[in-house]
């Protein structure tokens, strides 16, 4: 039995009417995962035993008719802690780490009756934009297995796009939800910083990281955000939940909504077909009654440089805890304490992680702190101020999610800077702590193009409103890759 093309609401109705049980749905999902896994490599761990135990308990308690997520399977990125399920961050360093607690986002999802079916592959410690730095091998793009799926939440995006699961969780530090969502033709949202607790997320850049949802459609994405968003005493940066239902504006028209189109987002380095797709999308929003006008975000061009100083500096601090002593990988060829530290970290971390630790350590070092880290913080403030000026007059910002569609596997590994520039359009959103969504907006070379909508802080419901209006009047979200059963 397969439920690939059923929406969450359709699955909920089947569960409530007892046409299917949570156990049957979970078993079908596990079969979907396994049948596509050899082609995609989107999972690090398939949690079959734990998922079936959860499903049985939900069946025995009964499906909650008022809770649309009760009994629905969920895949979780492998840097988000799951009680009793390996959480490796796709690194040799944590190859055997099994948390004894759930991340708050996972605990919230379980409280809603969601069933964790596995941990998805990712760039190691979320450091990468292609899904290729994983210790467990690269994930493949759902549309073309010779292409990258984007990163770092590579497996979470590919799993949803391919029909392995309907919903998944990722994390976004510089575009790690939105870019793979764009490359795989699905909906991915980075919430406002603080909307979802970071407790239980293996930290990369603590001032940038945010957990968020993947789904095939806008409404399903919002339903998952409803489940995971919460204020949390265990995360001092979490914010009070302002709104009970992030779907509240879905279905409302967008007549009179003011949308800004930054000229910098369609400038140098943007693929011509991607640019054309976004300009066509802007015209579509105008047909729906929105007002679209060109604006400038003059400091956005410095975003990549600022990000790689700040994020790497925070990573060099956060990753100090992985020392071969308390948990994770320990080198066997060490004869003293210093060698345990050095050898365990040298052998346990991959090349990209070590590159960023060294970059961050350099940026924080005596004599360079003022020139790099402090200055990056000052430019970050200018980027934030650019957004504030635009949002004084506009409701949302529109642009491409990525400068290109998915590129060939192993084509940029020799050129880290070129890969870093692929996050040019998503990074400023993290630096400013803003919400941003990627939705399918067209195709180029047979591969999905993502449209990014950015809002002021705590404007997720407005972002969902505009995204849903676009989705309802286009059919890009209905296109499916061959592995899902589509014609493309």
Swiss-Prot record:
EC annotation from Swiss-Prot or TrEMBL: 6.3.5.7
The record's annotation in InterPro entries points to: Amidase (IPR000120), Amidase_CS (IPR020556), Amidase_dom (IPR023631), AS_sf (IPR036928), GatA (IPR004412)
UniProt keywords (A-Z) are: ATP-binding, Ligase, Nucleotide-binding, Protein biosynthesis
Chemical reaction(s) catalysed: L-glutamyl-tRNA(Gln) + L-glutamine + ATP + H2O = L-glutaminyl-tRNA(Gln) + L-glutamate + ADP + phosphate + H(+)
Q: Which GO terms describe its cellular component?
A: glutamyl-tRNA(Gln) amidotransferase complex
- Record-linked HAMAP family: GatA (MF_00120)
Q: Which PANTHER family match?
A: GLUTAMYL-TRNA(GLN) AMIDOTRANSFERASE SUBUNIT A (PTHR11895:SF151), TRANSAMIDASE (PTHR11895)
Q: What is stated as this protein's family in its record? A: Belongs to the amidase family. GatA subfamily.
Q: Which NCBIfam families match?
A: gatA
Name-wise, this protein is: Glutamyl-tRNA(Gln) amidotransferase subunit A
- Record organism: Streptococcus pneumoniae serotype 19F (strain G54)
């Amino acid at each position: 039995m397969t439920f690939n093309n059923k929406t969450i609401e359709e699955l909920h109705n089947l569960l409530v009417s007892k046409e299917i049980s949570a156990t049957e749905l979970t078993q079908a999902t596990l079969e979907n995962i396994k049948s596509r896994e050899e082609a995609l490599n989107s999972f690090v761990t398939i949690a079959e035993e734990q998922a079936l135990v959860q499903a049985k308990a939900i069946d025995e308690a009964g499906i909650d008719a008022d809770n649309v997520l009760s009994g629905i399977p969920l895949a979780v990125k492998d840097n988000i802690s799951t009680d009793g399920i390996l959480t490796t961050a796709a690194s040799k360093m944590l190859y055997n780490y099994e948390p004894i607690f759930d991340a708050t986002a996972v605990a919230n999802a379980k409280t809603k009756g969601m069933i964790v079916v596995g941990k998805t592959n990712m760039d190691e410690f979320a450091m990468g934009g292609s899904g290729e730095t994983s210790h467990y091998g690269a994930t493949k793009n759902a549309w073309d297995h010779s292409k990258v799926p984007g990163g770092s939440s590579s497996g979470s995006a590919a799993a949803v796009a391919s029909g392995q699961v309907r919903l998944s969780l990722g994390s976004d530090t510089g575009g790690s939800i939105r870019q793979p969502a764009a490359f795989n033709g699905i909906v991915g949202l980075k919430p406002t910083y603080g909307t979802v607790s970071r407790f239980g997320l293996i930290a990369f850049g603590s001032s940038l990281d945010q957990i968020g949802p993947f789904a095939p459609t806008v409404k399903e994405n919002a339903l998952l955000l409803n489940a995971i968003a919460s204020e949390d005493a265990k995360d001092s940066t979490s914010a009070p939940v302002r709104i009970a239902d992030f779907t509240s504006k879905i279905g409302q028209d967008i007549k009179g909504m003011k949308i800004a189109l930054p000229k910098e987002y369609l400038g140098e380095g943007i693929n011509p077909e991607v640019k054309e797709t976004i300009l066509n999308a802007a015209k579509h929003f105008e047909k729906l009654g929105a007002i679209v006008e060109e604006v400038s975000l003059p400091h956005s061009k410095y975003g990549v440089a600022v990000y790689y100083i700040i994020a790497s500096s925070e990573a060099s601090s956060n990753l100090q805890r992985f020392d071969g002593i308390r948990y994770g990988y320990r080198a066997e060829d060490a004869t003293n304490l210093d060698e345990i530290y050095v050898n365990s970290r040298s052998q346990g971390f991959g090349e990209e992680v070590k590159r960023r630790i060294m970059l961050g350590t350099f940026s924080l070092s005596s004599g360079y702190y003022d020139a790099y880290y402090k200055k990056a913080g000052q430019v970050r403030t200018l980027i934030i101020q650019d957004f504030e000026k635009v949002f004084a007059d506009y409701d949302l910002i529109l642009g491409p999610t990525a400068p290109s569609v998915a590129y060939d596997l192993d084509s940029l590994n020799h050129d880290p800077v070129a890969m870093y520039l692929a996050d040019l359009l998503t990074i400023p959103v993290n630096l400013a702590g803003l919400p941003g969504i990627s939705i399918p907006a067209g195709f180029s070379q047979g591969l999905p193009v993502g449209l990014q909508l950015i809002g002021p802080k705590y404007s997720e419901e407005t972002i969902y409103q505009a995204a849903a209006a676009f989705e309802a009047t286009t059919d890009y979200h209905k296109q499916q890759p061959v592995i899902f059963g589509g014609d493309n």
